[in-house]
Amino acid sequence: MKPLVAIYGPTHTGKTDLAKDLYSRFPSELISVDSVQIYKGFDIGSNKPDKKELQKYPHHLIDILDPNETFSVGDFKKRSIKILQDADKKSKLPIFVGGTMMYFYSLLEGLADLPERDDLIRAELECDLETFGLDYLFRRLEDLDPEAALVIHQNDRQRILRAIEVCLITNEKFSTIQKHAVKEKILKRKILTFAIVPQDRHQYKKELHERFKLMIKRGLIDEVRGCLLYTSPSPRDQ
């Protein structure tokens, strides 16, 4: 069994370049660990590799969902396990690269054993979201679990929905369940981690500013507008 390579750090630090270099040197599978690059259409803002680059360096978990589809940490874990199993069968080195630390945490540290998603409850919550808006759901979370509401941002749609869903499934507070849940350790292999951080923070901020200006020139604003139209958010949340 090959070790797992984990390359993580903030944006624009050379993570992808290192992953591509390793891919060129060893029989490998590249796995994106990015909660935005999984979506089609979020190309400029996520600094997604272009089609030509992806042909040369194919990545798992890029462009796998439409913008209106949901993807949880649990979904990432399940897909990653399958990719790891396939990589092992081919004797390939799995290289996980990206900046979504919660995804990495689910792999390296394990996830709390929470109840599976309930499609009926989730559909009802999605309906409430569309009808009444996210503020309404956040107030509902405050009523169900004030402690969870203190640590979940009021604009974090995914976590608000999940916390309420768990409360309704279990008739217990989400925060209480998290405290007592046993984490499921899924990896029993050697892990090689590369944490890439900028050495000169002043220069780093300057480069980020320049990259953002370039993104604007490339059409970032139109990209965001297109994604907002595609996802059709509730008027209350605009």
Where are these regions (language model features)?
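Phosphate/pyrophosphate-binding catalytic cores of soluble transferases and nucleic-acid-acting enzymes
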Residues: 1-232
